[in-house]
Curated annotation (Swiss-Prot):
The keyword Metal-binding does not apply. Disulfide bonds: none annotated. The keyword RNA-binding applies. Belongs to the intron maturase 2 family. MatK subfamily. This is Maturase K. PANTHER family: MATURASE K. It is found in: Plastid, Chloroplast. Usually encoded in the trnK tRNA gene intron. Probably assists in splicing its own and other chloroplast group II introns. It comes from Hamamelis japonica (Japanese witch hazel). Keywords: Chloroplast, mRNA processing, Plastid, RNA-binding, tRNA processing. It holds the Pfam family MatK_N. GO terms for biological process: mRNA processing; RNA splicing; tRNA processing. One of its GO terms (molecular function) is RNA binding. GO terms for cellular component: chloroplast.
Length: 504
């Protein structure tokens, strides 16, 4: 945000209402370039395309309007020299610059809304790991959980309409519509998952912004009723961005609920309801009954379809009992189990045996999906047997080792909260042996001979920082160090999920 505030010496009206001129500013694409180089990628930093530059983008946008492409049909795009073989490259450049521009007013207003509030180290709340201590504390007292697949908008115009409530610059919105129309023929995007996925992969930053703004729109209303009913002040509600007709929509929904759905208003009065969203899924957990959870399910379906024009089905919401169900959450397999304990009590000549069952929030790493991700990345086969990476054979030995070590440490860092470390040991073994096979293949040697020549140096490279510190404090692998390493550790510096840890 310091970069935004340093570059943008504009008054409030220009910041909020006239974003379009920023498209032709040099520093916008410098910011997009820096974001591409400095973003947190847990695998490998692929860098930025050398063909991308602010000058090319400016000439491109100018040519778009000079050639009057607004009247050119999508069917003629194949003959259009502007939309030739570099169509994907142009699309990437425009989307990155536009994403930076539309994020600026949101980021500035979010920072200003947090100023003056007593939020200690609010940047730690950005970490993915910050949600797990919350789950450990809350889910032990709940009974049911709903796994919800958030529906995609049936048309990209819905995303633009949602953005219209927040961004008041008509020129920027017209450019966004034109961009979708020219590059993706959005008339055909009636929820085909393939088309949406292609769009999101090519223009990930822009798509995530539009999608999150759409989800935040319905969540703001959903959480508004939830917070009003429980009379609890939500810290995050102060950071909600103003939107046109927001309170009119709230008033309309209240009238609908009061007049037509009086029987379901008590849904909002459950004080033990917790909602968590991540990626394209969300979790709704409650201490209520199965009847209550089913009413929530059908309410959400109608809420999405009637007020936000997204197609959803009750089958996309799965209700399970926490005591006998494990749910996939951000690369972890989470469950609430019973930890039995027996207490012997003696009173005079009589003795009693008391069985106590204490709930425990268990988090483990699902080994099968993770091995599948490693197999897809060519580190092993589908059975988990390590294989060499021919693509790395042309690199230097130190570069090969550094790449494998970085991936191994990032996976260990992300999965440090696992209750059982056995799965991590197996993943480290696969990566370590895959590295050895790659080096042996490069030197035309056997793995045994190469490891014998290298000694224990390769093994030490794969030790994480935690293991290195513990080995210095507690030498000879004492029971204390083993007990500390087996414990769950959550970090507040993880702001993106590892691609290998994402089993979607």
């Amino acid at each position: 945000m310091e970069e935004f505030q340093g570059y943008l010496e504009l008054d409030k009206s220009r910041q909020h209402d006239f974003l379009y001129p920023l498209i032709f500013q040099e520093y916008i694409y410098a910011l997009a370039h820096d974001h591409g180089l400095n973003r947190s990628i847990l695998l490998e930093n692929v860098g930025y395309d050398n063909k991308s530059s602010s000058l090319i983008v400016k000439r491109l946008i100018t040519r778009m309007y000079q050639q009057n492409h607004l009247i050119i049909s999508v069917n003629d795009s194949n003959q259009n020299p502007f939309l030739g073989h570099n169509k994907n490259l142009y699309s990437q450049m425009i989307s990155e610059g536009f994403a930076v521009i539309v994020e600026i007013p949101f980021s500035l207003r979010s920072v200003s809304s947090l100023e003056g509030k007593e939020i200690v180290q609010s940047h730690n709340l950005r970490s993915i790991h910050s949600i797990f201590p919350f789950l450990e504390d809350k889910f032990l007292h709940l009974n049911y959980v709903s796994d919800i697949l958030i529906p995609h908008p049936i048309h990209l115009e819905i995303l633009v309409q949602t953005l219209r409530y927040w961004v008041k610059d008509a020129s920027s919105l017209h450019l966004l519509r034109f961009f979708f129309y020219e590059y993706y023929n959005w008339n055909s995007l009636i929820t085909p998952k393939k088309s949406i996925s292609i769009f999101s992969k090519r223009n990930q930053r822009l798509f995530l912004f539009l999608y999150n703004s759409h989800v935040c729109e319905y969540e703001s209303i959903f959480l508004f009723f939830r917070n009003q009913s429980s009379y609890l002040r939500s810290t995050s509600s102060g950071a909600l961005l103003e939107r046109i007709y927001f309170y009119g929509k709230i008033k309309h929904l209240v009238e609908v609920f009061v007049n037509d759905f009086q029987a379901i208003l008590w849904l909002f009065k459950d004080p033990f309801m917790h909602y968590v969203r991540y990626q394209g899924k969300s979790i709704l957990a409650s201490k209520g009954t199965p009847l209550l959870m089913n009413k929530w399910k059908y309410y959400l379906v109608n809420f999405w379809q009637c007020h936000f024009y997204v197609w959803s089905q009750p089958g996309r919401i799965y209700i399970n009992q926490l005591s006998n169900h494990s749910f996939d959450f951000l690369g972890y397999l989470s469950s609430v189990g019973l930890n039995p304990s027996v207490v012997r009590s003696q009173m005079l000549e009589n003795s009693f045996i008391i069985d106590n069952a204490i709930k425990k929030f268990d988090i483990i790493v699902p080994i099968i999906p993770l091995i599948g991700s490693l197999a897809k990345a060519k580190f092993c086969n589908v059975l988990g047997h390590p294989i060499s990476k021919p693509a790395r054979a042309d690199s230097s030995d130190s570069d090969i080792i550094d790449r494998f070590v970085r991936i191994c440490r990032n996976l260990s860092h992300y999965h440090s909260g696992s209750s059982k470390k056995k799965s991590l040991y197996r993943i480290k073994y696969i990566l370590r042996l895959s590295c050895a096979r790659t080096l042996a293949r490069k030197h035309k040697s056997t793995v045994r001979a190469f490891l014998k020549r290298l000694g224990s140096g390769l093994l030490e490279e794969f030790l994480t920082e935690e293991e290195q510190v513990l080995s210095l404090i507690f030498p000879k692998a004492s029971s204390t160090s083993r007990r500390l390493y087996r414990g769950r550790i959550w970090y507040f510096d993880i702001i993106s999920i590892n691609d290998l840890a994402n089993h979607e």
